[in-house]
Amino acid sequence: MSNVKKVVLAYSGGLDTSAIVPWLKENYGCEVVAFVADVGQGAEELEGVEEKAKASGASECHVVDLKDEFVKNYVYPTLKTGAIYEGTYLLGTAMARPIIAKAQVEVARKVGADALSHGCTGKGNDQVRFESCYAALAPDLQVIAPWREWELSSRESLLGYLAERNIPCSASATKIYSRDANAWHISHEGGELEDPWCEPTEKVWTMTASPEQAPDKPEYLCVTVENGEIVAVNNQALSPFECLSVLNDVAAKHGVGRVDIVENRLVGMKSRGCYETPGGTVMMAALQAIDELVLDKVSRSWKTQLSEQFAQLLYDGRWFTPLQQSVMAAAQSLCATASGEVVLKLYKGSVTAVQKRSPHSLYSEDFATFGADEVYNQAHAEGFIRLFSLPSRIAALQKQQKG
């Protein structure tokens, strides 16, 4: 093992990272400092985490509140790009990794650590995301990934490892779901979900109401958008984190934001995930409604390309890269006119933009009307159609001439 004196571990208080603390001490002979990122996963997840870390053998535990920064500097910029991975996934886990890695590096610098560690498995995307961020922010620090080194390969073996060392752990050996939560979403993987023929039961979902059990009466919300950012809900000005929290509560009550997908992982395999993103689903619907009004056809096409590019780079862990800065700058320029108000209808799992307006709207009722108008000469369409269809006309004529 390399000569490591002090390592900062991205610690959650779960089974894996509880076992990693003593494993690092035993195998590297180093001091272990636990770092916990509060990205809005909830008080229940954070309760007693410092005591757990020290009981596992950590010399210190730093709990860093990142909730506001996460939503303001990571969620909101991503929303401006319209990024949705493979057309469905709103990237909740991927969005949180850069800020967690950044804060972990900051703690490492603060305590004088010479290494970083995480509890990501060797099969998943997160190992790549974390370590790509480490490489960009702290190339001088060694990275230790226990799941790629140790021989512990199951929940049972991890529990046994902790029991042998008299380290308390509340986890059980029962096969349960792997979950990841933050202010934006919660993900569910594993268990019977690994069979894509198995429909998720209600015990899977923890954040949203069942659409069937949601209120029988729809609820309407008015969202205010300024330059691609949601700044108010029902005319009440709120911070980004507050906007998301309010929308999470309301949308979750109506069963909005559930998706069940099989996605292509960065490491080459497919995986199935169930995601709950209630407030984020409402936010995305509102911003898309504004884009419909203010972006011309070519700009919307360009925005679609940017959205796909940003979704891929974010999913792949390329936040701290020139590519991210370039795509973000392009998306930001398209948001210059993305301001207005959207009324959304929430009802039994669905969210629909039913009213929208913008001072920069390119929609003109005078031009679009099916009734009589004085601004559009329909005869002008004939010349346009002849030019637009000219390539098809030439090809057809040549085909006729060749017999």
Swiss-Prot record:
Pathway: Amino-acid biosynthesis; L-arginine biosynthesis; L-arginine from L-ornithine and carbamoyl phosphate: step 2/3. One of its GO terms (cellular component) is cytoplasm. ATP binds at A10, Y11, S12, G13, G14, L15, D16, T17, S18, A37, G119. It catalyses: L-citrulline + L-aspartate + ATP = 2-(N(omega)-L-arginino)succinate + AMP + diphosphate + H(+). L-aspartate binds at T121, N125, D126. L-citrulline binds at Y89, N125, R129, S178, S187, E263, Y275. One of its GO terms (molecular function) is argininosuccinate synthase activity. SUPFAM superfamilies: Adenine nucleotide alpha hydrolases-like, Argininosuccinate synthetase, C-terminal domain. It is found in: Cytoplasm. Keywords: Amino-acid biosynthesis, Arginine biosynthesis, ATP-binding, Cytoplasm, Ligase, Nucleotide-binding. It comes from the Bacteria. InterPro entries: Arginosuc_syn_C (IPR048268), Arginosuc_syn_N (IPR048267), Arginosuc_synth (IPR001518), Arginosuc_synth_CS (IPR018223), Arginosuc_synth_type_1_subfam (IPR023434), AS_cat/multimer_dom_body (IPR024074), Rossmann-like_a/b/a_fold (IPR014729). Its EC number is 6.3.4.5. One of its GO terms (biological process) is urea cycle. Belongs to the argininosuccinate synthase family. Type 1 subfamily. PANTHER family: ARGININOSUCCINATE SYNTHASE. HAMAP family: Arg_succ_synth_type1. Homotetramer. This is Argininosuccinate synthase.
